[in-house]
């Protein structure tokens, strides 16, 4: 079936291509020198029309004429959002057109960082916005998130085509586009599945590259934070030329970027203070903030949890000393002050390092005036390194009576006790680095051409392959527990017990002295530290063919259409050396009943593939032109049929229109049905086990629970309905002003989700008195009502299911003003998003929960904040080569929760300010431009926001919302020849 489908697509393309010489010859007499050649026309995958206020005014959107690019007039700008060729005002779906110049002005690091400063992007995953706690998921890169609907529900494109996924989550790292060759980024802020297929639920981000670039561009820049860390360096070069009278066009770029990261949480204010919450989050016991919160069942020396010596701790030499429990704060397992264990902020990173290297090349050749051949290749490598958290055993380390390191007086005090448990933080083991690397290769070849003057066609083949590797240095628990069980051999030497009872197992075992901070030797440390390795290989093959043009003319203009189809195959192959489905060999090992080899990274296998066959049609009909009831009215409709080999056939559609009653006012609206298919990892992943520190409100105990995640082959595509409606204003009475306002309503049914992360499942189950679906995910040894410490949960399920419904509504606002002033140009721009509602229904048995204005929305490890207002306001002035300006990024106030109770539930608004300046030496060869950018000029901290999990494991703020880097300086020079 696959072969026949691909053959039909290729045969159609070949027939069209073979007809080109005759068509070109028959039409040659009708082509004048002033006609636009085919190489200037966008492919069907790139065709669209601008529909934001900025799109109607190229100066507002930052477009300007340069030596190597020519800005089109407003009516000629072509942006993403449709498969049709159209002039500037006829596409009904809202699109933000953001030029590279505007993005790098205030975010010179990467284009994705600049996008994340826009109010419509919320909850994106990046080194600064993600966490460094878990190594079992992708941390490298920048995965964009529109409207906090998830990185999997936004489609990332380059020049209108898909890129190979770069991790196991199905997403694509937006850092890996050729940054120096990107002209603009088109952000579709409405459903676009009818035009682009699966994943375009919250929208589309299309990185548009320079097609006719000639000359050379260079970039050198360095950056550093006000704290003297997180230094960055970027070097890039791009070049373009033509040959054979312009018929052959070559473009290439090479880029290198490195950022050191922030290697210690103590490097930022509050990062070393171990803030956390006390209380249970109920009305009777609300959460309250406390400093220096410690684990009361663990210490750096070894706290004795059970047996006749319970409540005391070890000292060096295996003797016993008193333990100060600190002050209870109404939450089991933690206390303020005392001798309890605290997270060592020096041992874990705040942000990982990041290094990217990129190569890109494109060749375009005009075979005939109406037939073009193109080929492009991109190769990227991204690496990061961080140190997640230190190693500890939270009250569950079993020590046996025959342990050789116990002092004689301790043995005497134990009496007849044969074993007891200890809680210990092993500071001596030190930092445990985790490295991730992504290598990706994308190849795109194709043909495009024209048939007569009204029809265009294109056919292309895309092939991509990515390889994602993680190498985490962690404690091998089988080795660790074998080493802890230290006894005296017959010759009097201290050895691992397993070498006596089971010779040949755990060869080379080095005994560990666990009693007292500093007792672990370097040899023992080196023995227990091993590499947890996992790898993901993604493959993408896609063939597509498109035809578009005009059918016939009506009284108001031509009826436009586009039809096409594509065949896509994607596969994933994930492997690891710590697959939790493979039973551990625990022969001869006492005190360890665990099922995983490593404390943090235990990744199951995932192997699978699916194929997708799609056909689409889109039609645009003009109904009014310069009539008594309006200047213009255009309606647009699209439909797509998609067949998945895993879940069958699904249809998507869109209908919309644009009405211009008078000059300067346009109204637009769309209604669409969109889908997101489950990712290969969501379908085929094996079980992945992670140990997480949680406070169990039922037993009032802090400990380590096992979170089990995996794939679900019964998953089906999510279905969404999207409504957008808005106005675009370009009043002629106020030259230079443009504005837009758009309402959106997105409702997703059968959403794929892990219903609750581990802490949320425990808290919500407890708050509901055991009557919540969250309780079904928790496994306890003694049932759901027993409140003793022995009933601490043994596992918490985190398998994805089609059980959730999500609905979000809001308003996007944009205002721009650009005018000449005092011999220069002033450019003002404001963007804002008003979140009216964000309702999440975890499954049909519970009521929807309103998350707008709170941080209740679950994220991968921590909550995502959803303020009702977010805005970015910028002002820039240019004169005689000098440009300077500033930007304010406003994060509105919000409540900490609408579900849980807090003593202080209100979080005030926070404003971050940025400044930039540049000067271009216009008379110097290369026209070098010196620039400086200062982000977070006032060194503003984010809102104070401790987490409820392990004290001190995270900086006490919401990373998805607030800046954690502090004031940051970037200096550099750009040139073009």
Enumerate the language-model features and the residues they cover.
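N-terminal Sec signal peptide and the immediately downstream disordered periplasmic leader
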Residues: 2-119, 147, 236, 240, ...
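Short loop/turn motifs that connect adjacent beta-strands in outer-membrane beta-barrel proteins
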Residues: 212-215, 228, 244-247, 368-371, ...
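Short acidic/polar hinge/loop motifs at secondary-structure boundaries
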Residues: 161-189
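C-terminal beta-barrel architecture of Gram-negative outer-membrane proteins
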Residues: 690, 830-922, 938, 947, ...
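C-terminal beta-signal and adjacent terminal beta-strands/loops
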Residues: 747-749, 836-837, 888-896, 920-977
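Surface-exposed, low-complexity loop segments enriched in small/polar and acidic residues
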Residues: 168, 269-277, 315-356, 360, ...
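Extracytoplasmic beta-strand/coil segments of soluble accessory domains associated
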Residues: 61-68, 87, 116-161
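N-terminal periplasmic accessory domains that precede
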Residues: 111-114, 142-145, 173-178, 199-220, ...
């Amino acid at each position: 079936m696959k072969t026949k489908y691909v053959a039909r697509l290729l045969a159609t393309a070949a027939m069209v291509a073979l007809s080109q010489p005759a068509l070109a010859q028959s039409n040659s007499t009708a082509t004048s020198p002033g006609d636009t050649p085919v190489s200037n026309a966008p492919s069907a995958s790139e065709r669209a029309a601008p529909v934001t206020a900025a799109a109607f005014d190229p100066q507002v959107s930052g477009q300007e004429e340069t030596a190597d690019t020519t800005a089109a007039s407003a009516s000629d700008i072509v942006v993403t959002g449709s498969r049709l060729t159209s002039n500037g005002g006829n596409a009904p779906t809202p699109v933000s057109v953001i030029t590279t110049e505007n993005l790098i002005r205030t975010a010179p690091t990467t284009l994705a960082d600049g996008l994340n400063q826009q109010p419509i992007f919320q909850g994106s995953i990046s080194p600064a916005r993600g966490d460094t706690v878990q190594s079992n998921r992708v941390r490298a890169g920048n995965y964009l998130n529109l409207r906090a609907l998830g990185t999997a529900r936004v489609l990332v494109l380059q020049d209108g085509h898909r890129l190979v996924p770069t991790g196991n989550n199905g997403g694509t790292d937006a850092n890996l586009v050729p940054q120096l060759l990107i002209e603009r980024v088109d952000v579709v802020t409405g459903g676009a599945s009818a035009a682009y297929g699966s994943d375009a639920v919250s929208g589309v981000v299309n990185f548009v590259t320079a097609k006719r670039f000639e000359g050379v561009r260079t970039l050198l820049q360095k950056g550093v934070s006000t704290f003297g860390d997180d230094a960055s360096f970027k070097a890039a070069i791009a070049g373009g030329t033509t040959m054979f009278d312009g018929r052959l066009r070559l473009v290439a770029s090479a880029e290198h970027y490195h950022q050191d990261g922030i290697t210690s949480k103590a490097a930022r204010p509050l990062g070393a203070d171990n803030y956390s919450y006390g209380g249970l989050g109920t009305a009777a016991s609300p959460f309250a903030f406390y400093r220096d919160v410690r684990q009361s069942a663990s210490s750096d020396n070894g706290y004795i949890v059970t047996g006749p010596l319970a409540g005391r701790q070890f000292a060096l030499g295996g003797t016993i000393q008193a333990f100060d429990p600190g002050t209870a704060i109404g939450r089991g397992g933690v206390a303020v002050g005392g001798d309890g264990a605290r997270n060592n902020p020096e041992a874990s990173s705040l942000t990982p390092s990041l290094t990217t290297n990129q190569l890109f090349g494109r060749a375009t050749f005009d075979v005939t005036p109406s037939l073009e051949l193109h080929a492009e290749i991109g190769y990227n490598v991204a690496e990061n390194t961080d140190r997640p958290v230190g190693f500890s055993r939270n009250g569950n380390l079993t020590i046996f009576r025959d342990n050789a390191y116990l002092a004689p007086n301790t043995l005497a005090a134990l009496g007849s006790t044969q074993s007891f448990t200890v809680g210990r933080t092993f500071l001596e083991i030190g930092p445990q680095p985790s490295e991730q690397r992504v290598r990706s290769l994308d190849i795109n070849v194709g043909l495009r051409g024209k048939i007569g003057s009204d029809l265009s066609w294109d056919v292309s083949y895309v092939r991509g392959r990515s390889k994602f590797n993680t190498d985490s240095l962690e404690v091998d628990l089988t080795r660790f527990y074998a080493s802890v069980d230290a006894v005296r051999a017959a010759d009097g030497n201290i050895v691992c017990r397993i070498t006596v009872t089971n010779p040949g197992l755990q060869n080379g075992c080095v005994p560990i002295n666990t009693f007292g901070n500093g007792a672990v030797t370097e040899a023992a440390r080196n023995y227990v530290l091993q590499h947890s390795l996992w790898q993901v290989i993604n493959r993408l093959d896609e063939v597509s063919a498109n035809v578009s043009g005009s059918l016939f003319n009506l009284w108001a203009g031509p009826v436009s259409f586009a039809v096409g189809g594509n065949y896509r195959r994607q596969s994933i192959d994930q492997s690891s050396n710590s697959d939790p489905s493979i039973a551990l060999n625990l022969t001869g090992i006492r005190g360890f009943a665990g099922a995983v080899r490593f404390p943090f990274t235990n990744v199951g296998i995932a192997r699978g593939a699916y194929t997708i066959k799609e056909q689409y049609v889109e039609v645009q009909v003009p109904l009014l032109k310069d009539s008594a009831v309006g200047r213009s009215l255009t309606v647009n409709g699209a439909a797509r049929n998609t067949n998945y080999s895993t879940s069958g056939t699904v249809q998507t559609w869109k209908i919309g229109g644009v009405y211009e009653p008078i000059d300067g006012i346009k109204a637009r609206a769309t209604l669409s049905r969109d889908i997101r298919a489950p990712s290969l990892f969501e379908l085929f992943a094996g079980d992945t086990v992670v140990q997480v520190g949680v406070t169990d409100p039922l037993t009032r105990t802090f400990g380590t629970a096992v979170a089990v995640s995996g794939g679900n082959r019964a998953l089906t595509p999510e279905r969404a309905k999207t409504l957008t409606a808005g106005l675009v204003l370009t009043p002629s009475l106020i030259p230079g002003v443009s504005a837009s306002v758009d309402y959106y309503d997105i409702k997703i049914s059968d959403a794929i989700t892990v219903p609750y992360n581990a802490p949320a499942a425990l808290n919500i189950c407890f708050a509901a008195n055991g009557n919540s679906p969250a309780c079904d995910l928790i496994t306890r040894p003694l049932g759901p009502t027993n409140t003793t410490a022995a009933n601490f949960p043994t596992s918490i399920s985190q398998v994805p299911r089609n059980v959730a419904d999500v609905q979000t509504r809001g308003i996007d606002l944009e205002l721009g003003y650009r005018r000449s002033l005092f011999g220069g140009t002033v450019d003002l721009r404001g963007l804002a998003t008003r979140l009216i509602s964000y309702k999440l229904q975890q499954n049909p048995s519970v009521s929807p929960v309103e998350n707008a204005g709170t941080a209740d929305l679950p994220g991968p490890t921590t909550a995502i904040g959803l303020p009702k207002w977010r805005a970015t306001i910028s002002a820039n002035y240019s004169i005689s080569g000098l440009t300077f300006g500033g930007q304010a990024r406003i994060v509105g106030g919000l409540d900490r929760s609408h579900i849980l109770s807090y003593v202080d539930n209100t979080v005030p608004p926070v404003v971050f300010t940025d400044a930039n300046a540049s000067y271009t030496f216009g008379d110097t060869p290369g026209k070098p431009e010196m620039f400086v950018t200062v982000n977070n000029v006032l060194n503003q901290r984010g809102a104070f926001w401790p987490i409820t999990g392990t004290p001190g494991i995270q900086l006490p703020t919401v990373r998805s919302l607030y800046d954690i880097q502090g004031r940051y300086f970037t200096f550099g020079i750009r040139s073009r020849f």
